[in-house]
């Protein structure tokens, strides 16, 4: 059921009066290709590498693994990194305003061809890995990958790599000869296989039925060999592997299947990335169906240190524009409720289709819904991601039909032009990157919303009806007095508007009409737009983006602790790099005070970590519970809730890796730290504390560990 929490907050954005032409990319630090920790100003283009362009036929697989005529969509088609590089260099992507590419997982996958139900299948998609320290030869060599990174950066494009540490490749619990038996290699040396797994590299709990979060984490996803992250060999191997790719210049990581890995391990994992020499933006895939929102999903987005693909937004956009099963009022409700639920809404990655969904464009249908959905996504909060071929109106329902070969590169398609007009606006107007959202006019077919950041504003109007024009009257706005031209130049039947005294003069929004009007100005007072990453230990360098910081260094305050001098690494009007001070761990507010002594509003919920993080599995035996009770964990550090029931860790699990009345949970805790902890039983507002003395355990200096105790009455 959709949450209906209302939120009407002022939004800040920066843009000049629109003239209907594409706006130049601002050369400010926050919008730079070098800003690897904030993607709010970017427009991402998702590519299934094998399905984009074959730039080097010499690396194509041979024999049964390759479909030269593209007739079997489960086989390789030949797309590679050279092909992507070619499309960067020929201007197709830059011409569309794309500033980040999200490519298929680049690591070595199995080469076996697997027959499922009479159809040959391959690892063309990149999700059947076997060696995270080598490249997929069908995509190219390390040299090819480095060339792709270099070409992208030279064209002001970031590169995000897909990464799937949840699993290796298909395996059978009864047939070791099936495929490659889940084999995992370390730069060519076999670490182990799913069968005869004496090292405990994998979970052996059968396949998940998706009935519980626990089942999804500790059981196999379909027939994929599920990696056991609570294993020191695995933990160190995966950390080494991601550093290899970061050292090659990757700018961001999209984690596959985050719903199916322990949140505690993932928090410790991304914290190691943020503490490395090459910290980058991270986001993960937690699939949600239409009208679905779960507390586990919200908790992950708010507490893991990683951001998420915004499935709630995507599903609603599809229902409103593609399927017409919901209204613009419903869309406004989702914008409001997600803005209230997610602490870091501007970091959620928005989209309208991807490799796991039916293509947005339907065969034989009007293209206007696709164009309007793109316009809304590009002007809404979050980081917009466009699936390859959507701008060419590619169609296809379900896997693999939604992963066809790129059909063409026509720059005259209306959808391409919509992206071309609006993507640069995210760079030039901070209202789109950082601003909040206010509904200005809404009915079942029309949505008028405003983004605002300081005095920067963008106003967007969309009419999804293909037959009815609507008179718009009484719409309020923060736009200054004046006449504003549609940024889209009438491409989607938009019009100009006049603003007087905070009200838009009455106008008619055409059937199928979409318009964007905007205003930009400089800010004299500091306004924080984003902080990246959103968690870090003392000593880590974080990036603060926004406007009005000035060019003279002053101070950044964490809670009540001011940071000045050399601990401010750099200070520019739109971006500050600062070291996290030695303050109490936990969520804290961050403010910026400029040289004039003006202090910004706070960026809340920056999560200060106690120290470097490791993963510990906490297990408690004989914790019997009454109906409605669950077991939670709390202890003496912020990562364990600081002895408060409200911040306790859990609810713990008791079905897969251990069985009731034993409960367990994998938790990210500070390394090499003397921990004290207890378990509590919770039923609503009723909390029952464990008796006896505090349990004690010293966490390891690195890796993972397990501590097992008995419940104390």
Swiss-Prot record:
<dbReference type="InterPro" id="IPR002909">
    <property type="entry name" value="IPT_dom"/>
</dbReference>
<feature type="binding site">
    <location>
        <position position="60"/>
    </location>
    <ligand>
        <name>Ca(2+) 1</name>
    </ligand>
</feature>
<feature type="active site" description="Proton donor">
    <location>
        <position position="285"/>
    </location>
</feature>
<dbReference type="InterPro" id="IPR013780">
    <property type="entry name" value="Glyco_hydro_b"/>
</dbReference>
<feature type="binding site">
    <location>
        <begin position="259"/>
        <end position="260"/>
    </location>
    <ligand>
        <name>substrate</name>
    </ligand>
</feature>
<comment type="similarity">
    <text>Belongs to the glycosyl hydrolase 13 family.</text>
</comment>
<feature type="binding site">
    <location>
        <begin position="220"/>
        <end position="223"/>
    </location>
    <ligand>
        <name>substrate</name>
    </ligand>
</feature>
<feature type="region of interest" description="E">
    <location>
        <begin position="610"/>
        <end position="713"/>
    </location>
</feature>
<dbReference type="GO" id="GO:0005975">
    <property type="term" value="P:carbohydrate metabolic process"/>
</dbReference>
<dbReference type="GO" id="GO:0046872">
    <property type="term" value="F:metal ion binding"/>
</dbReference>
<feature type="region of interest" description="C">
    <location>
        <begin position="435"/>
        <end position="522"/>
    </location>
</feature>
<feature type="region of interest" description="B">
    <location>
        <begin position="166"/>
        <end position="229"/>
    </location>
</feature>
<dbReference type="InterPro" id="IPR002044">
    <property type="entry name" value="CBM20"/>
</dbReference>
<keyword id="KW-0479">Metal-binding</keyword>
<keyword id="KW-0328">Glycosyltransferase</keyword>
<feature type="signal peptide">
    <location>
        <begin position="1"/>
        <end position="27"/>
    </location>
</feature>
<dbReference type="InterPro" id="IPR017853">
    <property type="entry name" value="Glycoside_hydrolase_SF"/>
</dbReference>
<feature type="region of interest" description="A2">
    <location>
        <begin position="230"/>
        <end position="434"/>
    </location>
</feature>
<dbReference type="GO" id="GO:2001070">
    <property type="term" value="F:starch binding"/>
</dbReference>
<feature type="binding site">
    <location>
        <begin position="127"/>
        <end position="128"/>
    </location>
    <ligand>
        <name>substrate</name>
    </ligand>
</feature>
<dbReference type="InterPro" id="IPR031319">
    <property type="entry name" value="A-amylase_C"/>
</dbReference>
<feature type="binding site">
    <location>
        <position position="260"/>
    </location>
    <ligand>
        <name>Ca(2+) 2</name>
    </ligand>
</feature>
<feature type="binding site">
    <location>
        <position position="254"/>
    </location>
    <ligand>
        <name>substrate</name>
    </ligand>
</feature>
<keyword id="KW-0732">Signal</keyword>
<feature type="binding site">
    <location>
        <position position="403"/>
    </location>
    <ligand>
        <name>substrate</name>
    </ligand>
</feature>
<dbReference type="Pfam" id="PF01833">
    <property type="entry name" value="TIG"/>
</dbReference>
<feature type="binding site">
    <location>
        <position position="80"/>
    </location>
    <ligand>
        <name>Ca(2+) 1</name>
    </ligand>
</feature>
<feature type="binding site">
    <location>
        <position position="59"/>
    </location>
    <ligand>
        <name>Ca(2+) 1</name>
    </ligand>
</feature>
<feature type="active site" description="Nucleophile">
    <location>
        <position position="256"/>
    </location>
</feature>
<dbReference type="InterPro" id="IPR006047">
    <property type="entry name" value="Glyco_hydro_13_cat_dom"/>
</dbReference>
<dbReference type="GO" id="GO:0043895">
    <property type="term" value="F:cyclomaltodextrin glucanotransferase activity"/>
</dbReference>
<dbReference type="InterPro" id="IPR013784">
    <property type="entry name" value="Carb-bd-like_fold"/>
</dbReference>
<keyword id="KW-0964">Secreted</keyword>
<dbReference type="InterPro" id="IPR006046">
    <property type="entry name" value="Alpha_amylase"/>
</dbReference>
<feature type="binding site">
    <location>
        <position position="355"/>
    </location>
    <ligand>
        <name>substrate</name>
    </ligand>
</feature>
<protein>
    <recommendedName>
        <fullName>Cyclomaltodextrin glucanotransferase</fullName>
        <ecNumber>2.4.1.19</ecNumber>
    </recommendedName>
</protein>
<feature type="region of interest" description="A1">
    <location>
        <begin position="28"/>
        <end position="165"/>
    </location>
</feature>
<dbReference type="InterPro" id="IPR013783">
    <property type="entry name" value="Ig-like_fold"/>
</dbReference>
<dbReference type="InterPro" id="IPR014756">
    <property type="entry name" value="Ig_E-set"/>
</dbReference>
<dbReference type="GO" id="GO:0004556">
    <property type="term" value="F:alpha-amylase activity"/>
</dbReference>
<feature type="site" description="Transition state stabilizer">
    <location>
        <position position="356"/>
    </location>
</feature>
<feature type="binding site">
    <location>
        <position position="78"/>
    </location>
    <ligand>
        <name>Ca(2+) 1</name>
    </ligand>
</feature>
